[in-house]
Amino acid sequence: MATKRLARQLGLIRRKSIAPANGNLGRSKSKQLFDYLIVIDFESTCWNDGKHHHSQEIIEFPAVLLNTSTGQIDSEFQAYVQPQEHPILSEFCMELTGIKQAQVDEGVPLKICLSQFCKWIHKIQQQKNIIFATGISEPSASEVKLCAFVTWSDWDLGVCLEYECKRKQLLKPVFLNSWIDLRATYKLFYRRKPKGLSGALQEVGIEFSGREHSGLDDSRNTALLAWKMIRDGCVMKITRSLNKVPTKKNFSILARNLNTIQVEEMSACNISIQGPSIYNKEPKNIINPHEKVQMKSICANSPIKAQQDQLQVKNNIKASLHNVKSSLPLFNTKSSTSVGQLQSPTLNSPIYMQKQGKNEHLAFNTKSKASTVGSELVLVSTTVPTVHHVSDLEMSSTLDCLPVLADWEDVVLLPASQPEENVDCTVPISDSDLEISFNSGERLMVLKELEMSSHENFGDIEETPQKSETSKSIVYKSPHTTIYNVKEAKDPGSDISAFKLPEHKSSTFNRVNANMSHPLVLGKHPLLSGGTKRNPCSPQAFPPAKKQPFTIHEEKPTSSDCSPVRSSSWRRLPSILTSTVNLQEPWKSGKMTPPLCKCGRRSKRLVVSNNGPNHGKVFYCCPIGKYQENRKCCGYFKWEQTLQKERANSMVPSHSTGGLTFSSPETSHICDRNLSISTKNSLRLRPSMRN
């Protein structure tokens, strides 16, 4: 006896607890958080044919109400559910659960069963004055009594009912999202792993009553086990909840999400200010003016104050949005061309800018509408973003050119995106310049030699002005601007005027579409509404040229080896040579072709959705899932950022610079000049079509 008593004191053996006959005697040793517990134990369809069945359906829905103060079962609920996906029960299922086929055939669908269960819950709520609460850490002292759900494992409410409601698109009651896992509580309280419900009952000295795997009997026995644990001093607490965690309780996730939003807003501001369509060079990529105003409002209301101040100092975006009409009444010409398309040509053609005065600035014309002239020309506004840093050199040039350039047009005519087949023009692409030829009678040649000031948004561009080699007479001359009156002889063999631009060497932005880069070249369409005469008293509207110098001149046959060329003899080049499609950085527009994985298939584009350092990042992986049968995943994985860097590095000269000579039956050749297409200007093929 002494040895047995010593063993009990050391904890080697314990006194066997004999349950009372009624199972309700005794009192709880500790104050419980919940006054009532509703024990649930579902029975579902099952098979023993060796196949993996993904969808199990509830066929018995039992519940018992346990009073944690007395240990009595105050109410019970039971309903047989008719399965919809597998209406015929297997022999194994009927033998295991004891449920007959006739019982489930006479049962109700799960939707009606949930409705009946909610009515039963509402009834006991009124009778017992109970409520369902989650996250309770202290006993309730009010007259309202708390209640919680209890299951033997997480399978009943966390797997079976959850996924069946999702498959059948049923609205699950909210109070079923939190429960107490009695098996996990048992393991934590007694510090041993139970061998099923019957094994746990045997360990605490309770004999299983009824039929095993019967839903109602399992619920009753689970309630007895819970009452035994309560009498032993176990405090029942919520162990599992499907409710979303409030954001205020998780500051790390909140801060990470705020940082992501701020980065997106910063990028949206930069894109909208620096030109949203600067990478979409085709004229069809025109942004809705309402969307443009919305994007500007996002940038103006961005929480990043430093970014906002920087943008306000450089471009005065906020003031220009609200004071376009009041402060700049001259700029009332409306157009649907996006700001990016008005801003990007400033790298090549100064006609997109208008001089307003010494201390006046330029502003956005956000309210714009489209108007078309004919079928080939588009009427657009020449209003561009604010430029604060204007050098004294440019201002002096502005004052010098005031008498002559006073009546410059407020609008320009741009060629359409793709000219018609009968358009009498040609656009040969060269490594050093771009030429567009049209018929003309008399042209003014403007030679501007202004310094290109450094700007953060455009980069440093240094170009050498091209010299004119035509016979000319000086009409007006200033320290930085010279205007010639060039009269061409009516030579039947030559009727050409060319508009040359220096090569754009900046790698910051892509090349502007060739059709959008030359607004002055209009063929026989005059630029001035009133002829070539200008009114010197009218206000000046030609902006400072923040770009490389350029030359407009008449080209005449000056060499014996240069055959005359008629504009009618020139054939329109294929569109693949005249348009510079954005192929240099296809991922800028967000439409990047997924690479090929190791197994030869097109990879799948996915986004990291879980919260972490890589949240929101895009990656590519093999389209074959890891768990697909009869297929093997090659394990391909690559971040989109890494892929972009690889593609940028792979854009090394891959095309040989061959000469191209454009001729016609009426012409032998053009000054023996071969148009060299450099690797920078050459077209890139899709990644899947490259050698």
UniProtKB/Swiss-Prot annotation:
CDD domains: ERI-1_3'hExo_like
Residue ranges annotated for the Exonuclease domain, each copy included: 37-226
Sites where the protein binds Zn(2+): C597, C599, C622, C634
Residues the record lists as binding Mg(2+) 1: D41, E43, D218
Annotated active site: E43 (proton acceptor), H213 (proton acceptor)
Disulfide bond annotation, renumbered to this chain: none
Binding site for Mg(2+) 2: D41, D156
EC number: 3.1.-.-
ZnF bounds (GRF-type): 597-643
Cofactor notes: Binds 2 magnesium ions per subunit.
UniProt-recorded Gene Ontology molecular function terms: 3'-5'-RNA exonuclease activity; nucleic acid binding; zinc ion binding
Cofactor(s), by name: Mg(2+)
Pfam families linked: RNase_T (PF00929), Zn_ribbon_GRF (PF06839)
Keywords: Exonuclease, Hydrolase, Magnesium, Metal-binding, Nuclease, Zinc, Zinc-finger
List of residues binding AMP: E43, H213
Similarity annotation: Belongs to the ERI2 family.
Annotated protein name in UniProt: ERI1 exoribonuclease 2
Taxonomic path: Eukaryota, Metazoa, Chordata, Craniata, Vertebrata
Gene assigned in the entry: ERI2
